[in-house]
């Protein structure tokens, strides 16, 4: 079978988020080829994408070996032959045999059948991108590790901050989705949704289907915390550049699941940014036009960087700070002096 290598690599790239880091579930570190699609599954996420030229191939191949080999092949077209216990790939003067498992042992039946597709609100991905950094990482309160989708609202909170985004249209269904899944989902141009039993499915124009587990439970009512009456504070004009420098030290290589944060402290007419990771620390002091302002808070640094493309001010009350745009609100608890 002659196959376009570039198209095959693109298909494999699309489904990589469904791979597991360790094979706790059999074949969860493999690409499964089923008919005209390639599929991955890791118990939390399953992704499938169309593949051309391999419609008659059914089985699983170790993902790392296949992907890394194809990435090093220079020819645009390759030949793939399915033999008894291996797949033979020929390209130019090279050929490689990869172990091939004919039986698909991934528990894909858990994902369930995909029902009728419904159109998503056009700002749904923007809402997810804005909201998920506010989710908790502490699994002692699993509901707060999720983004809450309810009606025309997309909400997230770690109990220290709350984000609520108002969609232009109501969602076809209500559900809770883990922030870890959202982090991958927002990389796709999803336009349609189908809600199943314990799983929700999204589809792109190219035919990628991204499925992820939903979480059972009730998200807390955050509405009463979102309105703030207080003084307006204007951030320094050079703050975004300072945040970009701080971001180098906010990212933790040993814990990539943790959202990088920065601490913001305002006192005596200065705004002080601090960030720290396992390799070093950062501090920068900026002048403000608010000599009497005194507060501090911690926030996801990439959210704050993106925020300065939208607005440069916030409102300060006795115990919280509020940011607001046309369709969203973000409230953060002010840290006490003991917490500082």
Task: State each model region's role.
Residues 1-340:
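Structural preference for solvent-exposed beta-strand-turn elements
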């Amino acid at each position: 079978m002659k196959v376009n290598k570039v198209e095959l690599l693109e298909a494999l790239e699309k489904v990589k988020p469904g791979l597991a880091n360790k094979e706790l579930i059999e074949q969860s570190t493999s690409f499964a080829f089923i008919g005209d699609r390639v599929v991955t599954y890791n118990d939390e996420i399953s992704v499938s994408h169309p593949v051309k030229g391999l419609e008659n191939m059914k089985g699983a191949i170790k993902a790392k070996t296949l992907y890394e080999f194809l990435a090093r092949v220079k020819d645009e077209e390759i030949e793939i032959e399915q033999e008894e216990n291996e797949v033979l790939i020929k390209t130019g003067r090279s050929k490689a045999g990869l172990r091939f498992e004919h039986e698909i042992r991934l528990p894909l039946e858990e994902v369930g059948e995909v029902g009728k597709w419904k159109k998503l609100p056009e700002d749904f991905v923007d809402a997810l991108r804005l909201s998920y950094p506010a989710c908790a990482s502490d699994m002692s309160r699993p509901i707060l590790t999720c983004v809450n989708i309810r009606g025309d609202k997309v909400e997230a909170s770690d109990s220290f901050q709350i984000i609520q985004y108002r969609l232009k249209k109501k969602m076809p269904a209500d559900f809770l989705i883990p922030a870890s899944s959202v982090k991958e989902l927002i990389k796709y141009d999803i336009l349609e949704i189908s809600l199943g039993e314990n799983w929700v499915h999204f589809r792109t124009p190219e035919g990628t289907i991204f499925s992820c587990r939903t979480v059972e439970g009730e998200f807390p009512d955050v509405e009463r915390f979102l309105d703030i009456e207080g003084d307006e504070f204007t951030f320094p004009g050079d703050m975004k550049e300072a945040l970009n420098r701080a971001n180098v030290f906010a990212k933790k290589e040993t814990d990539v699941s943790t959202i990088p944060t920065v601490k913001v402290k305002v006192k005596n007419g200065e705004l002080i940014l601090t960030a720290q990771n396992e390799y070093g620390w950062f501090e920068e002091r900026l002048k403000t036009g608010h000599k009497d302002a005194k507060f501090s808070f911690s926030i996801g640094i990439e959210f704050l960087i993106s925020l300065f493309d939208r607005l440069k001010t916030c409102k300060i009350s006795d115990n919280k700070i509020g940011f607001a745009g046309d369709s969203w609100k973000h409230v953060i608890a002010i840290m006490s002096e003991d917490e500082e």
